[in-house]
Amino acid sequence: MTPTCDGGTATITGFFGGTFVFNEAPTDGAVIDSSTGLITGGDYNTTYSVSYTTVGGCPTTTIISITSVEDDDSSFEMTPTCDGGTATITGLAGGTFTFDTAPTDGAVIDSSTGLITGGDYDTTYSVSYTTNGDCPTTTIVSVTSIIADDSSFEMTPTCDGGTATI
């Protein structure tokens, strides 16, 4: 048996034509294909006991335990910047960042780092991060860019220069 994200896949090394069943019925919704042994619909990181019984004059049964693979951790955090945000991956690195909803203000996202640039301040962006491991998952986080400081001022002319009013 080869583990998968929601169960496992069987490889028959003995006689073909037998029947696969769970040795103990799972309570997580997993199902097994009786002819191929493919387990689907289960939970990650769960152990299943599977029996394979051959048919014929002298049937035999083999019981194998298999533990499904754990889903990738796609968690990340966004820190706002003036024109977007920066991402910090807290889960599995090496995935891909995209905008969950495409912005209309010219903002772009670096697919490797999650850095958003070229956006407007005080704008909310929805960012998606998808892992590329054995059991890919996606997390979506929103970030609102920082409101830019007001740097405007006025100058009043005087005889020896000027006076600034902020």
Question: Which role does the model predict for each range below?
Answer:
Residues N45-G56, D122-G133:
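Append "Rare intracellular matches occur via the same short Y/T/C beta-strand/loop motifs
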Residues D6-G14, D83-L92, G162-I166:
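A short beta-strand segment in extracellular, disulfide-stabilized domains
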